[in-house]
Amino acid sequence: MVRVMATGVFDIIHLGHIHYLRESKKLGDELVVVVARDSTARKNGKVPIFDENSRLKLVSELKPVDRAILGHEDDMMKTVVEVMPDIITLGYDQKFDEADLKRKLDQIGVNSRIVRISKYDGNLNSSSMVRKKIMELIGERF
């Protein structure tokens, strides 16, 4: 059984998220999605609209997802060791250096393949684009 791990904040679920998860699921038999903690999202400059438990519930209900969990706040590698994925997928816009991630995986003895998932071709394919569009619509009305 090939286990795939996908990660993200998953705030304001949109078609870009669905594309990322569908493409991730195609790579294996089981898709485990790690939802970022609120504190982790804030450290990376994102203030989630939905709290971590709401985002976890939303993600767990999505069709491609076999299991959704919250990530560790202090060390991403702890989550990797818990999941032990054969493949780790990254979204097109996730700010992971793949070589650095591979080094960290080697240090903890995890031999996961890293796959970067392509960008979704549709409109509003990122949370920042969705937020921007909402602000434009609000601005037009007031």
Curated annotation (Swiss-Prot):
It comes from the Archaea. Its cofactor is a divalent metal cation. CDD domains: cytidylyltransferase. One of its GO terms (molecular function) is ATP binding. NCBIfam families: cyt_tran_rel (TIGR00125). Transmembrane segments: none annotated. Belongs to the archaeal FAD synthase family. It catalyses: FMN + ATP + H(+) = FAD + diphosphate. Pathway: Cofactor biosynthesis; FAD biosynthesis; FAD from FMN: step 1/1. Keywords: ATP-binding, FAD, Flavoprotein, FMN, Nucleotide-binding, Nucleotidyltransferase, Transferase. The keyword Nucleotide-binding applies. ATP binds at V9, F10, H14, L15, G16, H17, D93, Y120. This is FAD synthase. One of its GO terms (biological process) is FAD biosynthetic process. Homodimer. Pfam families: CTP_transf_like. Its EC number is 2.7.7.2. It comes from Thermoplasma acidophilum (strain ATCC 25905 / DSM 1728 / JCM 9062 / NBRC 15155 / AMRC-C165). Catalyzes the transfer of the AMP portion of ATP to flavin mononucleotide (FMN) to produce flavin adenine dinucleotide (FAD) coenzyme.
